[in-house]
Each structure stands twice: as C-alpha cells, then as structure tokens.
Amino acid sequence: MEQNQNEEFLVYEFDQINVNADQQEVDLDDQSVVLSTYEFPSFYDMAVDAISKDFNSTHLIMEELDGVNVIYDIFDSEALEKWLDIDTYFELKPFPIERFELFNRLLLHQFQTLAYNRPRASWSTLRNQATQSVIEGFEDEFSDLPIQGMHNESWECLAPELRICFMFRSFKIKPSILLQVSRILAGSLMFPGLNLIGKKSLLDMFNNYNVIEYLDHYFPTSKYDSDEYLKFIRFDLVPDEWKLIVVKHEFENSFRFLNVHGKTEEKPYHKAMRGPPPDQWYTLLRRKFIFRSLKYTKRLIRNLLDY
C-alpha cells in the first residue's frame, strides 16, 4: 500500500513538469537526412498496385475517424502494449525491472504530451526531450537504463502506417484521409526512406507546405535516373531469373510486333535473354519501372488530397 502511495506521489510530482508549447519546435542540432548516404540492407519490391484498392467507406465511419487526433490513435494502438512490455527490450537486459516499468510509464505520459504540442518535432527529438524531463524530475534515478536502445525499439513497435501518420501529423489533413495516405506510403517504394526520416529528423518539413511537395523533396521524379530514390533498390540482391522477367515484360509493353507474311519475327528481348544476364538492360528498364511506380504513388496521394 505504501509503495502505491509513493508511486502515485511520484506521478503527481511528475505531472507538474509542464511543457511549454511555445518553445522552439525544431531541434536545431538535427541534421537533414541525405538518403543516398545510407545503406538499406533489404530489397523492397514495388507493391503499390496491390494497395491502390478503394479505401472509401461509409460517411459515418469517416466522420468517426476524423474526430480522433492522430496522436491519440498512435498511443491507443497495439504499440502501447509493446512499449510497456519488458520482453520487447529483451536484448537490452539486464536492467532493474521495477525502475524500468515506472520510467516507461512516465516517459510515455510525457512523450504523448510533447507529440501533441510539437507537431513538427521528430521522434528522436521528442523522445530525448521527454527522457530528459523524466530524468531531471527524478534526480537521475533512471540514468543507468539503456535509454537509446529503448528509443529505437519503441519506433519499431509502431505499425508502418502509424509511423507515416506521426510524420505528417503537422499537416492539416483529415485523420481519415491521412490514414489512407499513410497506408499507401507504408506499402510503397518510398517507405524505407520515410521510415528513416521520421525517426531521425523532420527538419526539412518546414520548407515544404504539403505532402506532395515533401515527397518531391526527398523522392524527385523530375528525371528517372536520379540516384536519390534508386538507393532503395539493391540491384545485387535481385535474382538473375527475375531480371530476365523484367526485361521481357518491359519489352513486350514497349513494342508491338507484326506477323509479316505469316512469319513471326524474333522479338528483341529474345536476343537480350541470350548469353550473360542482361544487367545493362535490366538497370535501364528497372529505372523506368521505379519511376512509373513513384509517379503512380504520388498521383494516388494527390487525388486523395485533392491537389
């Protein structure tokens, strides 16, 4: 009983640590993310077509969704249980379990307040500020916990679409529309980059006034040979057999062949498929494939946002 009273007292005292919503929203120590300087270990195929289904539902459901703030939706998700579950941080052990549980509850309380009041701050900035407030409020009682590792794990607990929702929470978009946009982006070629940006820094969001401009900033489609977004396709992980399929598919879509005097001409991709794997053909055609995929994703989002 005495322990519960002490815990309630600690939480009460912690609640007195208020957040100044008028303070500067961006951590000036944040550095803009240059996507082409990062290595992405996994191969991400395009699955945009598979998620371009109709997300529309009844007006009643949409109105209900629009009444919920994105931040509360994030903290009401399955991620909350994972954040509070000590098994989530199994690889970070050993650490004192009792103090970890108290620290985690206090951290989530403070983090939720900060996320609501500072819609343009990155995940890392908010977690660091929330952590600092908790530690200072309790005289460094939790300073020996593996805090940085806990930050990384907490981001990974979020469903991909909720990570995108968190990133774009500062834009004036109805929650129901934002969820649709987030689902599209979470299943698109752009997700690996967006995932890194949302976790590291949202600094460049100040220079972009809507979602499309923000995507164009990091994933330019002004020319399809830009390495900024080709970085997310690891050519060396693509099987040779799949390269042949891509080459054949692109040639068949690009050309129409005529049957001349009853004789079928040899199609150019037959020649390309002879001998060594057609890496040069594949690289060129794959760039076009990626370019079309990005344009298609942006068009879907532009139609949803009606601009």
Swiss-Prot record:
InterPro entries, A to Z: FDV_Vp7-2
UniProt source species: Fiji disease virus (isolate Sugarcane) (FDV)
This protein's name: Uncharacterized protein VP7-2
Gene that specifies this protein: S7
